[in-house]
């Protein structure tokens, strides 16, 4: 049986955007789609209804469950209408959202989540469930933001933009590049590999630096990046791969290149310690500020 693409849904606009993106991804992968709604609320007789207006008044847990079932049914029907022929299943499960979603991701090709909109500060904010879930699963996790305007069901296949991938040539990049090339091959688009760098302060201020040193470092990074891409270029000869070695903070450079991307892929190192962060600063910044869907790929 083909593993599904799993998407977490709760009825909010972010999860609806995630469900639509996940459905299109499932079609590309020729995989079934699984919608999961997690009952993650306090166990009290009465509580505010999730997804309802603040002045809707308290409702019981059973009514919340009926509301969740209605959301699942409505979203399932909408996906089937927009993507006829796609196999869709839905399930409602109790528990803590991040933990349940991580378990559901274990037998999936991919987990897709909605990412919240703008917060009080400039830029987007990633919800705590998204951050926690990314750190709990080795399955690729894609965070999707809602479009500013509703996206109609496509009448015909549209051309895809590039898949942008942030590459640190000092890290193990096989899983990350493999994901990026595979996604680009499915879409018939290019891969744009981005590495941002700057000289350590030990080299002194730029005006005092021998230009030859800067060029030597840049050439070394470009060679390392090209070497990382070489085996994937051979494996996916139909995928055009572009290299971007840019001076500046890596997160800033990836975000700049991602502005016109169809999908952005970043890596995260698997950390087995029970405490501490599970996201590096580049992945963290891209997740919070990129407008395109962001895929987080775990690696050792």
Predicted regions and their residues:
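Structural beta-alpha unit
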Residues: 1, 14, 62, 66, ...
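Small/aliphatic-rich secondary-structure junction motif
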Residues: 1-56, 159-211, 233, 240-241, ...
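General small-molecule cofactor/ligand-binding pocket signal
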Residues: 34-36, 89-93, 142, 192-194, ...
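A short acidic, glycine-rich active-site loop
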Residues: 55-70, 211-221
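Glycine-rich, Arg-bearing micro-motifs that act as flexible, cationic patches
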Residues: 110-132, 160, 263-288
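Short beta-strand elements of ligand-binding domains
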Residues: 114-115, 141-147, 295-298
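Short, structured interface segments
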Residues: 130-151
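Structured core of small recognition/catalytic domains
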Residues: 189-266, 277
């Amino acid at each position: 049986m083909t593993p599904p693409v799993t998407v977490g849904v709760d009825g909010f606009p972010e999860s609806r955007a995630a469900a639509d993106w996940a459905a299109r991804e499932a079609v590309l992968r020729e995989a079934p789609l699984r919608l999961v709604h997690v009952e993650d609320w306090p166990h009290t007789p009465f509580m505010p209804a999730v997804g309802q207006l603040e002045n809707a008044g308290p409702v019981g847990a059973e009514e919340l469950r009926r509301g969740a079932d209605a959301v699942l049914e409505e979203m399932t029907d909408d996906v089937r209408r927009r993507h006829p022929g796609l196999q869709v299943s839905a399930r409602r499960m109790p528990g803590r959202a991040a933990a349940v979603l991580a378990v559901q991701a274990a037998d999936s090709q991919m987990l897709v989540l909605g990412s919240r909109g703008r917060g009080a500060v400039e830029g987007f904010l990633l919800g705590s469930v998204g951050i926690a879930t990314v750190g709990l699963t080795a399955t690729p996790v894609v965070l999707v933001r809602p479009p500013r305007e509703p996206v109609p069901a496509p009448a015909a296949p549209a051309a895809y933009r590039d898949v942008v991938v942030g590459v640190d040539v000092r890290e193990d990049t096989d899983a990350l590049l493999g994901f990026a090339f595979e996604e680009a091959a499915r879409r018939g688009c290019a891969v744009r590999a981005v590495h941002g760098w700057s000289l350590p302060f030990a080299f002194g201020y730029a005006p005092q630096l021998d230009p030859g040193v800067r060029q030597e470092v840049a050439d070394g990074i470009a060679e390392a990046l090209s070497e990382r891409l070489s085996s994937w270029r051979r494996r996916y000869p139909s995928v055009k791969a572009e290299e971007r070695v840019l001076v500046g903070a890596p997160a800033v450079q990836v975000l700049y290149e991602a502005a016109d991307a169809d999908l952005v892929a970043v890596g995260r190192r698997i950390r087995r310690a029970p405490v501490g962060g599970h996201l590096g600063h580049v992945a963290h910044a891209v997740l919070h500020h990129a407008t395109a869907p962001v895929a987080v790929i775990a690696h050792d």
